[in-house]
Amino acid sequence: MKQRYIYIAAALLTLGVTGVRSAFAGQLTTDNCQQTLHPEANDSQFSIFNSDTTSILSTLHSETLKASEDARPTTLKECLEKGLNKNYSLRIIRNEEQIAANNATMENAGLLPSVSLSAGYSGSAYGNNTTPREGDVVKNRGIYDDGIDAGIDVSWTLFDGFKTVANYDRLRELSLISSTQTRLAVENYMAELTAEYYNFVQQRQRLQNYVSAVELSRERLRIVYERWMIGSLSRLDLLQARVDFNADSAQCLKQRELLASSRIRLHELMAQDSLDVNFTTLEENIALLTLPTFDDLWMQTKENNASMIMAAQNRTLADIELRSVRSRNYPYVKLNGGYGYRTNHYGAGGTLRRNQWSGDVGVSVGFNLYDGKRRSEQRNARLNVKNAELEEYDLTLSLYTDLADLWQAYENNRMLLALEKENVVAARENYAIAHERYLLGDLSGIEMREAQKSLLDAEERILVAEYNTKVCEISLLQLSGGITAYME
């Protein structure tokens, strides 16, 4: 069985959004959303914020504030602890593990004797006529005879070609496999929850980016409106600024939905009673761990990977099944014994009561000469052993390939992140210069928008690179069996 990992291709990780955290991050408030410049203007078409826009932005701001004020910041460790205890899928698989452990007993394997106790009662009522050779007929009526019996029987297979021993080993190995399956499910769950936790961090940062973008667009719209009022800018400039502001506002609303979806998914993974509970993370940024070298990770993978361990257990199980089939080549020896007691009470005749004790013991030896399918089953069992070995080799190669791919993606994303951090410095300086020139009237609105978009895109690329690197880190730790590092 190959392990299902949480890692996703970089193309799927990128959500296609362009909002980013601005260097001039400002908080979108109800007051500044409702602010309308030059209220004395009679042309309502050019009101900077109409009633619909004001209502939407006010709702966005109030819900964002409520979510941050009502929710207690939660760490990743707290989320994992809560989820590991409450998640329904994990609780089910733990119960299945307990069932497998309960089945791994000598009794279920047939190593212990079978003991049965029986008891019974019988009675009969009758009458008769006795005619002697001399004398009158003797009539007996209402005669009742009864009897009580009890016994204990023992049956024990002393030898069956070691089949019972193989059965016991098989049950114990199945119990170990069930434990490994539980571990695999726990590791998959931890990886999924950790990835979703940092996805929430990413989505929250992205929402802050869009709020900042709206604030920047609002400021630009205010400037354009004032210049339009005095005739220094055209109606086209005003309309373009309004279109850009509305576009940023729409992106902000869409991002709120994505953040809510991530929050709901986290509550589902943690099996929360209500999915509408406000939630926020203690971590405001995506922090990366320091990973071992590739060679060290590969050594840990060979030793600790749950799928690798399960493959070895499946190979052992195939060996046990072969031993079980081969046991039919040997004779069997069975021991049977019993002890009984019976008492009878007679309603007529010269005997009133009779008590009887009896015991028996026997040994049976047999050999199955031919059953029509023994040889084919043994050949198939040997092939199953070979297949288990091949599957283990195939899994080793697959895990090495996955590890190499993940390591390459991890290293590339780290270099990309370092490059984007340098790039954002230039983008911030470029925006600062553009903003200053725009205030002086030396820069057009389109050029100003382009500088703003360049900064936002640079910040977004950092956010995506951080999350992609984190997902690769999670997958590498999951692959090498070190996912529990997030519990520390």
Model region roles, listed by residue range:
Residues 53, 67-71, 118-156, 281-291, ...:
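Small/polar, glycine/serine/threonine/aspartate-rich low-complexity segments that form flexible
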Residues 91-95, 108-109, 144, 158-186, ...:
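Sec/SRP-type N-terminal targeting helices
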Residues 1-33, 488:
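Bacterial Sec-dependent N-terminal signal peptides
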Residues 38, 52, 58, 74-78, ...:
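Periplasmic alpha-helical coiled-coil/stalk elements that build and connect Gram-negative outer-membrane
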Residues 75, 82, 89, 146, ...:
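Surface positions of alpha-helical coiled-coils, especially the charged/polar e/g heptad sites
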Residues 25-27, 31-120, 126, 273-316, ...:
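Bacterial Sec-pathway N-terminal export signals of envelope proteins
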Residues 49-50, 247-272, 425-482:
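Short segments within alpha-helical structural elements
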